[in-house]
Structures are given as C-alpha cells and as structure tokens.
Design a protein with these regions (language model features):
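Aromatic-lined, polymer-binding surfaces characteristic
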Residues: 28-43, 48-141
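N-terminal intrinsically disordered, low-complexity tails enriched in polar/charged
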Residues: 21-29
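Bacterial Sec-dependent N-terminal signal peptides
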Residues: 1-22
Length: 141
C-alpha cells in the first residue's frame, strides 16, 4: 500500500511541476500572428485577397448597424441564431485584427455580452450550444 501511495504522490508532484507551462498568447484559435502577417502580405500583393478582404470588412461594417441577436427558437432549434452569432464573431474579429479599429472589438464584446444573457443556448439541441460556445471562444480570443 505504501508503494502505491508513494507512486501516486510522486506522479502528482511531477504533474504539478509540468502544469506550470506558460499559457498561449492570444490570439491562437484561428488566426495567430504569423497567419495574420501572411494574410497582410497576400492582401498587399494579390487582387483576389484584396477583394476578399474588402468583402469581409463590408460584412463587419454591416454588423455594426444591425440589431443585436435575439433568442428566437425555430421549431426545436436556435441554430439560425447560433450560426449568425458565429458569423458575426468571425467577421468582427477579422476586421478588428486587420484594421485595429476599436468599434469592431466593442461590437464583438456587446454581442458576447448579449448572448450570455440568453436564458440558455437551447441545450436540447447540442449543435446550438456548440456553435454558441465556438462563437464565444472566438470572440474571447
């Protein structure tokens, strides 16, 4: 018995030592700093990337004046709302990263605060919860 306790305590001590790893710097989920630099280079040199960049910024600009999302369940699903939330977080995050304009970050924060006030994210349909969680993670990152 003593041997098992010693092995367990040794394992726990070693785990604690290695658990002190440095946290990753934000952003790291989708577009890290290296990816951002590569995208900026592509935008500067290729028309297709310039067109896509413009389209993304137009999408983000349209969100700035759109009403906040409401918790409207269609049938048994909140999927349209959760997918729109995910779309908004992706566009606003991209626009903020590429332009550094604070209004995109403020709107993303407003959207996240808004959906956090929903009664729930429709747990009976796991995909609704998964997409809302993904949107929140991307917005936070």
């Amino acid at each position: 018995m003593r041997k098992y306790v010693t092995i367990f305590l040794t394992t726990m001590c070693i785990s604690c030592i290695y658990a002190k790893a440095q946290p990753l710097a934000h952003p790291y989920l989708i577009m890290n700093m290296e990816a951002e630099q590569n995208i900026r280079k592509a935008i500067a040199s290729e028309q297709l990337w310039q067109d896509y960049h413009k389209l993304m910024l137009e999408g983000a600009d349209s969100i700035l004046s759109a009403p906040l999302l409401e918790r409207i369940v269609e049938g048994r699903r909140l999927l349209n709302i959760s997918r729109e939330c995910l779309r908004r977080m992706l566009l606003l995050g991209y626009a903020y990263r590429m332009t550094e304009k604070k209004e995109y970050a403020r709107r993303a924060e407003l959207e996240m605060n808004n959906i956090s006030l929903f009664v729930d994210w429709n747990p009976s349909h796991f995909l609704d919860v998964a997409e809302m969680t993904t949107a929140m993670a991307i917005g936070y990152d």
